[in-house]
Amino acid sequence: MKKTLEIKNLSYSFGDNHILKDINIYVKENEVVAIVGSSGVGKSTLFNLIAGVLKKQSGEITIDGSDDYIGKVAYMLQKDLLFEHKTIINNVILPLIIAKIDKKVELEEGRKILKQFNLEKYADKYPKQLSGGMRQRVALIRTYMFKRNIFLLDEAFSALDAITKKELHKWYLNLKKEFNLTTLLITHDIEEAIFLSDRIYILANKPGEIIKEIKIEINPNEDIDVQRLFYKKEILNIMNIE
């Protein structure tokens, strides 16, 4: 399976503050990879570099083998950033509006994608009429509509309650299978990382560096909860968290 995203020897400093040191990671096509780490170790800085929000200082970033990576990712934050004065369908088609697609085509595509995601009944509602979990679903659909090579999810589920979060995790994994999504996510929630991911990178220290890569391999014929607990204990031990 080809590598959609690859980062080699990436370091970043802000003045005398060294934030990231010699980062080497990759994400394969249709893979979900998580980066976990304590606050302040540079997770969001890394995402901002991949997204082109921050200018790369050293190292390599390639998407599908090309170093022309700017504009090749779809970036979703913890806050859904929906426009409260726009209907759900008009929020969803925002990427098409930016791309200056014909208005009729925009709306047709919007209704089509909402139907695909089983959310067509919300098309003419406004964000304030939706629950937190439903708003986040809409935000994910809008992110998908950018049609980029890879999703960057920055604590995208962290503001949700535990039950809604679990529902959204399952929903996202179904989307990943159906639409062949490739995802790199930041999360402070280790259980979330284990549930969603094929692999996990642990970012630690100052400046932040990758100290461990863990491949998540769950055997469906054995106790799944016990296996996940084993991975959680391993990660907490590596991070020196009791």
Where are these regions (language model features)?
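Conserved ABC ATPase "signature" region
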Residues: 97, 104-122
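The feature captures the beta-strand-to-loop junction immediately N-terminal to the Walker
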Residues: 36-38
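Conserved ABC transporter NBD signature motif
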Residues: 59-71, 109
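A short, proline-enriched helix->beta-strand linker immediately N-terminal to the Walker B motif
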Residues: 145-149
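Helix-to-loop junction immediately C-terminal to a conserved catalytic motif
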Residues: 51
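Conserved ABC ATPase signature
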Residues: 126-130, 134
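Short helical segment in ABC ATPase nucleotide-binding domains corresponding to the A-loop/adjacent helical element
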Residues: 89-97, 107, 215
